[in-house]
From Swiss-Prot:
Its main location: cytoplasm. It catalyses: L-kynurenine + H2O = anthranilate + L-alanine + H(+); 3-hydroxy-L-kynurenine + H2O = 3-hydroxyanthranilate + L-alanine + H(+). GO terms for molecular function: kynureninase activity; pyridoxal phosphate binding. Its EC number is 3.7.1.3. This is Kynureninase.
């Protein structure tokens, strides 16, 4: 490996420490009292314990005791402002119809529809560390992955491999496999999968770089997750990108579990392309519109040979990728918008964009640096309580498989249970008003989100979790 592996490795983040009184309700409440981010919780609808188990549609019982919602890594909670934004959109549509495409209404929180995707891109850019022109809000994650692989995966008989992780999220795996097949190659030969060492769940940066060294001469693309969905491991995006590019490789990232969760600097890290969803940490709603990053060097449009012969990177074209100045000329001469917007295909859903703009308005009141500082302390507190609340247990009923190093994780902790405990424990947690995500065969993913979760949530969760574990052990 080259020297870049040592030079670019980030320094470790210092893990917070907690006093001997950490495992008390009073201590958790004192942390909340000093939390400068606590004001954001009131901007979300926290489901009540009663409603979380409802079997019919009900209005949120705001007067009831709140559930403990640790599932923002699967679906973020609804911001209160979403209803206002959606109503404004519906009122615009009902009152001025098609004119909503081109007319701003003074008393609306939304801009005209044709500019809404551009506005959302400007809101989202700081969250992923990009220029606004490098971000496009469009489609869904896997669709965007296919669109960008059509542009960035250009295999040849000599170089057709894709370096990826061994247990990618199934949709990513299917997309990669189908792209390889579509180009006429064998996925079993072209998919290079990197896994952890035996007995570990972490994939080291060093192993990734060694794999790049081993396969660089036959590889067309490196495509990895920013955060591994099952273990919660945060990959060293900066180092891996720089090293792979030093070997002449294109590097793409699936940031589904990283965007809105951890600080990113996609432009400065020179990432070629990335995709993400917005329904997890960005709280835009189930199946909401997704995001794509294309570095500015790949979005350039060159008119040096004249207006009729623009030069640009190959992509799958659609009318919404055309420059706004000539989009409605209908002359069938494609002139792409410069930047990521030139990779758009179809008119984006205004309903989806409306929900997203509402959710992002909360992010625009803070910064990823502030969010990550609370993540650091909130998740460290969760880890501390889980590991110290039963110190005398010589045969622990669980293992945390997420890296202990806070620089190698976001908010999520993945708790690996003993075999056969998952369903029973999950049912107990749900009955107690806790929402967490279970992943078969034996993992519960716990994600306290800094925008709406509290230290008291963490403390109460651990008490209930430990009691449920005891019952499982006795059964």
């Amino acid at each position: 490996m080259g020297s870049i592996a040592k030079e670019e490795q980030p320094s470790k983040v210092e893990k917070p420490t907690f006093s001997s009184k950490a495992n008390t309700l009073e201590y958790a409440q004192s942390l909340d009292a000093n939390d400068h981010m606590r004001r954001f919780r009131d901007q979300f609808i926290i489901p009540s314990k009663a409603n979380i188990k409802a079997t019919k549609l009900e209005k949120p019982g705001l007067s009831d005791e709140s559930s403990i919602y640790f599932c923002g890594n699967s679906l973020g909670l609804q911001p209160k402002c979403v209803k206002e934004y959606l109503q404004a959109h519906l009122d615009t549509w009902s009152s001025i119809g098609v004119h909503g495409h081109f007319r701003d209404l003074e008393d609306s929180p939304l801009t005209q529809w044709q500019l809404l995707a551009e506005h959302a891109s400007k809101q989202c850019a700081p969250i992923v560390g990009a220029k606004a022109s490098e971000v496009a809000m469009m489609g869904t994650l896997t669709t965007n992955l296919h669109l960008l692989m059509a542009s960035f995966y250009t295999p040849t008989p000599e170089k057709n491999k894709i370096i990826m992780e061994w247990k990618a999220f199934p949709s990513d795996h299917y997309a990669i496999e189908s792209q390889i097949r579509g180009h006429g190659y064998n996925p079993q030969e072209a998919m290079v999968m990197i896994g952890p060492e035996e007995g570990s769940y972490e994939i080291s940066t060093e192993k990734i770089l060694r794999t790049i060294d081993e396969h660089a001469s036959t590889t067309a693309l490196v495509l990895l997750p920013g955060i591994q969905y099952y273990t919660g491991q945060l990959f060293d995006v900066k180092t891996i990108t720089a090293y792979a590019q030093s070997k002449g490789l294109i590097v793409g990232w699936d940031l589904a579990h990283a965007a809105g969760n951890v600080p990113l600097q996609l432009h400065d890290w020179n990432v070629d392309f990335a995709v993400w969803c917005t329904y997890k940490y960005m709280n835009a709603g189930p199946g909401s519109i997704a995001g794509a990053f294309i570095h500015e060097r790949h979005g350039e449009v060159d008119y040096s040979e004249g207006e009729e012969k623009p030069k640009y990177r190959h992509r799958l074209m659609g009318w919404y990728g055309g420059d706004q100045s000539c989009r409605f000329l209908m002359n069938n001469k494609f002139r792409p918008s410069p930047g990521a917007s030139g990779y758009q295909v179809s008119n984006p859903s205004v309903v989806d964009l409306t929900s997203l703009c509402a959710a992002l308005s909360i992010f625009n009141q803070t910064s990823m640096e502030e969010i990550s500082q609370k993540t650091l302390h909130l998740t460290a507190y969760l880890e501390h309580l889980l590991l110290t609340s039963n110190p005398s247990n010589t045969n622990p009923a669980f293992r945390i498989i997420t890296p202990s190093d806070p620089s190698a994780r976001g908010t999520q902790l993945s708790v690996l249970l003993k075999p056969g405990r998952l369903e029973t424990l999950s049912d107990m947690l749900e009955e107690a008003g806790i929402v967490a995500d279970k992943r078969k065969p034996d993992v519960i993913r716990v994600a306290p989100v800094p925008l709406y979760n509290t230290y008291e949530d963490v403390w109460r969760f651990v008490q209930i979790f430990n009691a449920a574990l005891e019952k499982c052990e006795e059964a």
